[in-house]
Amino acid sequence: MEEEQLRYSRRLRHTLRRRYEDDGISDDEIEGKRTFDLEEKLRSSKYNSNFITYMEGKDFNMKFIQEGGLRDPIIFTKSEGLGIKMPDPNFSVNDVKMFVGSRRVVDVMDVGTQKGIEMTMAQWAKYYETPEEEREKLYNVISLEFSHTKLENLVQRPTTVDQIDWVDNIWPRHLKDRQTESTNVIQEMQYPKVQKYCLMSVRGCYTDFHVDFGGTSVWYHILRGGKVFWLIPPTDQNLELYENWLLSGKQGDVFLGDRVTECQRIELKQGYTFVIPSGWIHAVYTPQDTLVFGGNFLHSFNIPMQLRIYSIEDRTRVPTKFRYPFYYEMCWYVLERYVYCMMRRSHLTKEFQRESLSIDLELNGRQRPDTPSSSSSSSSSGLSSSSDNDDSSDQDWEEEEGLRKRERDRCRVERELQRKRNRDRQQRDQERDRHGRTERIIIHTLPASLRPLTPPPSLPLPTPDSPPSTSPFLTWFEVEGLRCLVLKLESLPPLKKCLPDGIHDPEALIFDIKRLLEDHAHDPPELALTGVPIIQWPKRSQYKVHLRPKIQFTKPHTMRPASRHSTAPPRTSGTPSGTTASSGARRRRVRCRKCQACVQRECGTCHYCKDMKKFGGPGRMKQSCVLRQCLAPRLPHSVTCALCGEVDQTNDTQDFERKLMECSVCNEIVHPGCLEMDGEGLLSDELPNYWECPKCYEGQKHTVEANHDRILLHSKRKAADNYESSHYYPAKVLRPPLGQSPPSPPLLLLPPSPSSAPPTPPSAQTQVPLASREERAKRRQLAREKENHPTGCDQSEGDRLRLRGPYLTVTLQRPPKELSSTSIVPKLQAITPNPRQPIRAAPLHQDEEREEEEEEEEEEEETENVMLGQRKDSTSMQKDVWLSVFHYLTHEELCICMRVCKAWYKWGCDKRLWSRIDVSRCKSLVPQALSGIIKRQPIYLDLSWTNVSKKQLIWLINRLPGLKDLILAGCTWSAVSALASCSCPLLRTLDLRWTVGIKDTQIRDLLTPASDKSGHDSRSKLRLLTDLRLSGLDISDVTLRLIIRHCPLLSKLDLSHCPLLSDQSVNLLTAVGSSTRGTLTHIHLAGCKGVTDESLLYLRRATNLSLIDLHGCKQVTRGACEEFISDLSVSTLYCLSDDKLIQRIS
């Protein structure tokens, strides 16, 4: 009986720990089966209220929404007139898998526990096709969002839903266009991606009462099968009951439909379309296998209910994963869109105006009627103002947009007239004094420079007698909703306002929306029922800006070369070909299909092959095998000559002049015979049809010769100056352009003395990064020129060209400098392999200015070389010095240092600095964290109390061959089971304390040799364990026998709080022939209720014990411990602490 109680208590503890580790406890994670009879709820006749409205599709339009605000559920038995588009009724789950991808991960709900798990579409399709009698559990998919997949084109929502959905009409549309990720990963989401869902349920699935996230409304089409709904209206009393029901945690015991006064059960059949308004509480049952398409949407005609549902989600702590994304950001954009569409004033940033509204004032150089600076005035004077300076381009554009402008002007005049009538009627009835109405209108009038452009003379100005057009009046639902929305956003604390990036000035936006609500507080309802939505995006074709210069993008393998008449102008003789822009992009070459690499098969082992789908990979790299990379790729057949426009007319055995050749410098492809110039080219052996054309080759030769002459002249001048002044300093030569080597080695100029030392060869000179030395040379040259020309006299043209041109002065030798051996900070001097010796004695007379310049230059070079690691000859020693410094930093400080530069980042990832990595108690291990662990190759890895999965752990251990110590305390067996594979490294420490779900069977799987690969090592992967921690596990003597057999080197064993262990367990560990008898040095038996004084008699056999932990063992007395110490005092001295901790002294 006591053993059964222990097992029951352990089971409770496991359940509590699993719920504690989950990220929040929601209504989707409540464990335990329901206690009410669902079959009785399906047969009961008390759910007979009547809330449903049956309609035809043609009646569900914008005018219907404006009249009723979409408050009641609607059923359409036929889809005609709705504007929806659906696949054929025989569309199956396998078809869904084909369109969204078999690897797509979907959230699956366990109907029995109402807890969510994850499956791939391939796994779900296999489960769905399994016969009903073979299904062990009931699973339900209710959240497969398939926008931006191939399935998206097969499903179209009702037309009216498209007209009122905030995502389509409110959210900046350029953000939606940027969405590329098909899944609902919040990090990659550019807009609220909740518009199209696929729901797949098997017979018997049940989803408990809930309200759709964020108070969204739902459209729902039954493609196959059927559904049963229980509907509860969103009254104040019902919503309060629903909130208390969620917080009670008794969803499995209470059927919410029995607690409310009114509830309706309705059955939906195949082909039905169902619309659930905002806030309606509903439960769903699936009487047969069903495939449903639907979606969620927010709209402007029930904003108060949407806000209330979102507040309920706040109070019930619904996890972010199950909530409407970007909710408050969407609310801000709602206010902005209403202000823009009603007042023609935009509060978006310039970028958002350009991308979503197609407004680009900076490029056009003029105002557009729909820009933020357009007037929102409704007075007729604002319409009659015009500018006399409108050019012809403005009039052309206005003629193009005349119809739309005329309609907008008529709406403005009609609205003004209606407001005047309202004011007169209200004054006559003496209900309210509207004297301030005119003042508000005057406030809205903008300066003449910001008013709309006057229509062209061909378009008459709107008059009061003009026929009425679509009225921009607001319905009562919109006015009340916007007022609630403003109050909600103003009441939010600053950190929860969630102001989006596209809003420029939120205070001005709030001010304008309040004025808008004041102006439209008494709009006549009959004029607001127009059947036309107020919030609409302007058509991009009408507002497309053509003034930005177009940039031509060309693909190298598809680009046709320019014709002969459109070739680039010839280069000047003074400009080398290597410094000019290439005449065209280099063409992408194709396989020759003749070499050995092209004809052989894939190896199947390289990283490219492993990525291929035919070898089981994801197919993302889209690269060919490493062994199949062509050795001589040829030009594609589509390439033509840039001069004559003809293709290659020859093969390898015919005339060379008709063979297409590609230049390695300018990338131009021509026939050699088409070049009308005399000269010689340079053939290349690297690729077929590859050469250096005569234009580039001849130009390069002339450039080299010119450079050579200039260097000689410059050297002669320097030598003459040296001889006259008897000064000794290194010569400065002009560096040729990048990619060209100097024609002759640099010479060290010495004064004519018979005792002077021979010049040092170039290989002995200290190499300096060219870019940094060029910059310093420029700075010094400019400083000297300022000193030489204090009155601002002009420099010579040659000096200016020398500073700006491609030829820059570079010092090839530096004077020696004493090294400091006591420097602590690692600098260049400390890491140079051999100290630099002076080439010759120092000169007797040296210019002081030159000495200061060289010292400053040397210090700058040393600092740059040390920080950026630019000295190749001392890189390894430099790294070792910095690593010795990095060893004193914590991991947090080291991560900060890694942001300094690329060299520090590379050195900071050295595995010697990361031998121990501790990520314990991290809420989530993202892929970037796992990649960082792999990059650092730790020896000790602590993953305790994390939610690491089996897949993640397998990925880690496969890439950490040097891992020795692994800490998995507090994890689950599903993750720890990854160690049972043959790829597990040879660990020396394994910590499995308080791991959920581990018993004797699981320990056997870990310790026995892996059998997942045939012919593998028959020994256990944990045979080198020296430290094993099994505290808090339900293990017995079976586990101890496995440890004795498979862990011969075990020295530390932690068996604390294992309730099934007894004195016989200790006897096994110290029995004759047991490997642990001679290897154990530390044994922990704290909290083991079955251990008594008899265990100490068995522990005397272990000759190497240094620590015995018995605290919490109630059946072990202190007297027995003292007796144990006294009996062993002859050979070994022990001491006893107050907590029954026996430690070895000598």
From Swiss-Prot:
LRR repeats lie at residues 945-966, 968-994, 1032-1057, 1058-1087, 1088-1112, 1113-1138. Its cofactor is Fe(2+). Pfam families: F-box-like, JHD, JmjC, PHD_4, zf-CXXC. Gene3D superfamilies: 1.20.58.1360, Cupin (2.60.120.650), Ribonuclease Inhibitor (3.80.10.10), Zinc/RING finger domain, C3HC4 (zinc finger) (3.30.40.10). Keywords: Biological rhythms, Chromatin regulator, Dioxygenase, DNA-binding, Iron, Leucine-rich repeat, Metal-binding, Nucleus, Oxidoreductase, Repeat, Repressor, Transcription, Transcription regulation, Zinc, Zinc-finger. InterPro entries: F-box_dom, JHD, JHDM1_Histone_Demethylase, JmjC_dom, Leu-rich_rpt_Cys-con_subtyp, LRR_dom_sf, Zinc_finger_PHD-type_CS, Znf_CXXC. SUPFAM superfamilies: Clavaminate synthase-like, FYVE/PHD zinc finger, RNI-like. Signal peptide: none annotated. GO terms for molecular function: DNA binding; histone H3K36me/H3K36me2 demethylase activity; zinc ion binding. It catalyses: N(6),N(6)-dimethyl-L-lysyl(36)-[histone H3] + 2 2-oxoglutarate + 2 O2 = L-lysyl(36)-[histone H3] + 2 formaldehyde + 2 succinate + 2 CO2. Residues 363-467, 554-585, 733-800, 832-867 are annotated as: Disordered. GO terms for biological process: axis elongation; gastrulation with mouth forming second; regulation of circadian rhythm; rhythmic process. It comes from the Eukaryota. A zinc finger (PHD-type) spans 638-699. Substrate binds at T207, K227. One of its GO terms (cellular component) is nucleoplasm. Binds 1 Fe(2+) ion per subunit. A zinc finger (CXXC-type) spans 585-631. Belongs to the JHDM1 histone demethylase family. This is Lysine-specific demethylase 2A. It comes from Xenopus tropicalis. The gene is kdm2a.
